[in-house]
Amino acid sequence: GNVIMPGQGAVYFSLGIHPMYIDDRVEERLQKIELAAAEGKIVAVGEAGVDRNALAPVEVQLKLFERQAEIAGQYGLPLIVHGVRAIPELITAYKKCRSHQKWIMHGFNNRREILMDLLRHGFYISAGRHAMNEESQVYRVLPEIPADRLLIETDNSDFTIGEVYGQVARRRGIAVEELQHIVRMNFDRLFKL
C-alpha cells in the first residue's frame, strides 16, 4: 500500500498481507515485511486484518494478523487494519498484543457503537470512499470522530483525495484547509518521518 503525505506529494510505503490474499507463501511474505521494516523501507505494516468474506478461515487470518502486529510493534510502526465483520476479534487481538503502537482502522464504515469501541482502544479512524455516500454509516458518524484520530484515504476508489476531503470537511462543518491541517498533524504524529 501507499501512504501519501498530505500536501507534499511524497509517497511512502506500507507492506502487509491482506486477508483476501493469504496463500502458501505467507512465511516468505512475512520475512519480506520484517526485512523491509528492519531496513526502514516502510512507514507502516498493513493492510493486515480479518475479513469474513475471505477464503482463509478466520483463525488463520487472526494468527497472521497477530504476527504482522508483532512486526509492527517490534519496529515501532503503525498497523493499518482491515476488518470486515470482525471488529470484536480485532479488538481482542489488540488487547492480546498489548500494543503500544498506533493502529489505524482503514476504510471505516460502521455504526457508532463500533466507532466508540475502537476509539476507546486508541485506534485512529480512516475515512474514505464510504464517506462519499450520505446514506453510509461512516457519513453519519463523521462528526463524532475526534479530530486527533481522523485520517482520510481513497483506497483506490473512483474518488480523488480532494473529493473525499471536501465531503468530510462539509460533513464536519469545517473548511477543507482546516481538515488538511488536522490530517497533517495526525499523519506527522503517526508516522514520525
Please give the residue ranges for each predicted region.
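Mid-domain alpha/beta scaffold segments of enzyme catalytic cores
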Residues: 1-193
